[in-house]
Amino acid sequence: MLQARVQLKRGFVKATTTGVPGGEDVKKGPDTFKRSALLALGALGIVYGDIGTSPLYALRECFTGAHGIPPTPANVLGVLSLIFWSLIIVVSVKYLLLVMKADNRGEGGILAMMALVMQRQRAQPSHRSRPMLITLGIFGAALLYGDGIITPAITVLSAVEGLHVATAVFDPYVIPIALVILVALFLVQRHGTADIGAVFGPVMCIWFLTLAGLGVKELVHNPAVLGALSPWHAVELFRHNHLHGFLVLGGVFLVVTGCEALYADMGHFGRKPIQLAWFSMVLPALMLNYLGQGALLLRDASAARNPFFLLAPSWLLYPLVALATVAGVIASQALIAGVFSLTRQAMQLGYSPRMEVVHTSAEEMGQIYLPGLNWALLVGVVALVLGFRSSSALASAYGIAVSTAMVITTLMAYVVARELWGVRRWVAIPVVGLFLSVELAFFGANAVKVADGGWFPLLMAVVVFTLMTTWKRGRDILAAKLRASSIPLKVLLGSFGDHPPVRVPGTAIFMTGNAEGTPPALLHNLKHNKVLHEQVVLLTILSEELPHVPHSERVEVEPLEQGFVRVVARYGFMENPGIPDVLKRCREKGLQFQLMGTSFFLGRETLIPTKRPGMAVWREALFAWMSRNARSATAYFRIPPNRVVELGAQVEL
């Protein structure tokens, strides 16, 4: 049975889950609701930052964006109806009630879902849908990198633009102020958020209460706007506006752009606390604010230029800009952390080269910082702000990547429902068809934005997809080449009977990706040094398609003959493998050695691109470049550098 406990560490509230998928998120007991409430508060600061800051710009873009429609009363009610039903169908039903059930041992996100499906199909490697699902999953993950760059830019910029409403004096300083905030945000990533993360939830709670209060203030003056909850107004909008009514969906879509991040962050808090936060606070606050903005537009159509900030009285504008900026920073922080986590998953699943991973908290293993990726994101965000120069222009670039990722998630959820849950086709197809009809409409409306900026996230997704697939394919080709040039371990051990090598004291650990063959580094050592240590450990570290591997299953130790020992260590895609941990588990299994008398032998391949079958020459050259720039195995696995011997070899791809 899945169990969860609440951990309170330095102000953090965290759900820790163990067991099988599909169980309860919170351990049953008299204080269940209290635990759920604490976790829900934490979810406000991490999970709902992106979708919670959409009121800053979403409704405005429906009327003033590149494909906006006039803010007539009928159009206002129609857009509000579309917003309400989008939040219900896409967020509430699809993600909160259905997709979040597709967890991989408590973890969510498109790569976690792909790994979940791959587990099921591992026994059927010839399954026809397997290559397609892998391609969809990797491309969906690549799309989210564009979201990770655009979200910080648009949320912070739209918040600072609230100064336009207060006074024109700040107009020349909006972009510099936004850039200062964004640069500071990325500079503090190296220090982590352990000390300030505890306030994220309460601050976002204040933000959502403010959203609700601003909306209610205007609603009491024009309660007729509540009629927009009827889907009839959405139908009327399409009937009267025709193509323009369809294109306005590109603006409506901005209210649901945080869904993929919401699903990816599920592992932090569990499904039920996230649902509790949505239905008890986030959804009511969002709808009250959108309805309040709509009521303002019914009273004054000119307010369409910035309906969110015009909801506030003049004396509240500066505090509201400050609060919106803080909320935007929190939303951006969640997206940046999500990109770090996604990249770690890609590394563990074999779709990304090794990068430097810094743990910013001694207590929470999930809080990580990737320096190289952090600076790449900063460059991308600054370039977006300087290139687009306004949140309205950025809105044109927003949407196409996320809408495509949503379609991919729906298709993969169908596979999960059919193959893992056993849902009958006649039940699954209509449900998936409903979601696809909505999401494909959003995709079509966003597709027209490609020329206006939508090309940026698509280009970025193609680049990331190319890098990820090239790395995976290159590693597979390299592994096949090394296996072909290797010899079975039994053959090597058998040859020692006639020509035994000289044995020297100590332990040698040879790291190898092939748990059955002889490590190339071992053969090179024998060839050049003509000696073997008294104890030889063949160590293979495997990444499983699970988020976490139980400690009891972490390490397998298999004694072989002539002083050889085979060790297989398994890690999940949410874990960081490390030699200190492996050695500790080996000692617990009875494998004895002295670290200062142990040498680690690693192979280091120099890759030579060729015109042989496998990959195009340009992809082989790209793979060789990625391999040269990947973090060394010594640093990545935290091997004592003064105990490492690297043996090189040239490999023609």
From Swiss-Prot:
Pfam families: K_trans, K_trans_C. The chain crosses the membrane at residues 37-57, 79-99, 134-154, 168-188, 196-216, 243-263, 278-298, 320-340, 368-388, 397-417, 426-446, 450-470. One of its GO terms (cellular component) is plasma membrane. InterPro entries: K+_transporter, K_trans_C, K_trans_N, Kup. The keyword Transport applies. It catalyses: K(+)(in) + H(+)(in) = K(+)(out) + H(+)(out). It is a multi-pass membrane protein. It is found in: Cell inner membrane. PANTHER family: LOW AFFINITY POTASSIUM TRANSPORT SYSTEM PROTEIN KUP, OSMOTIC STRESS POTASSIUM TRANSPORTER. Transport of potassium into the cell. Likely operates as a K(+):H(+) symporter. This is Probable potassium transport system protein Kup. It comes from Myxococcus xanthus (strain DK1622).
